[in-house]
Amino acid sequence: MIEDELIFVSNNYVKLKEVQKKLGELDVKVTSKNYNFHEQIENDLFCITADKTIIAYDNILKPLIVMDTGFYVENYPNNPGFPGAFIKTNLLDTIGIKGLLENMKNVADRKCLLKECLAYYDGDNFKVFESSQEGTLAYSEYQGTNSDKYTKLFGVFIPEGYSKTVSEMSSDEKDELAKTNPNVLSLFANWYKKERSKCLVKK
């Protein structure tokens, strides 16, 4: 059943604020709850996010959402598509952004893909949203002070059609990017609004 309260399963404070801001426009109250998931094996962002959502609901038993991000560097040396769906374990907790850039320093074709996946489950309704943005990997990391940078990848990801990383973009530029390529949070918010309207009509 569509409710006016949701749990965001994450310990990412900045990402929580983004979710609260977006869903707050619909008067939906969002609180966060951390959950320690077992390590995933399959490198499939859709499956990982969906599995996490079902597992979390079985333990929390309240309407919730789970968000995950995948990053795929097309011509990463000896491992095309690295780091894939395992950004934290394969990249951030190992070689880090500096290691990624070091290993890519002699690669001219720096195409990459940033994917996001959001899953919602309330015990009855189960829905998964996906979005992707093509772009290129920068040669150096932008060390900005953007308070809304919830992933370090924004400091090295240059969206297609732009000449700067996401972290370097102004708020207006980010809004423009979101309009041309809606992220999963926007897709979910639009769906949630429609579903809630249907429930109100039935009442």
Regions found by a protein language model. Name each.
Residues 2-7, 14-203:
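Anionic-ligand binding patches
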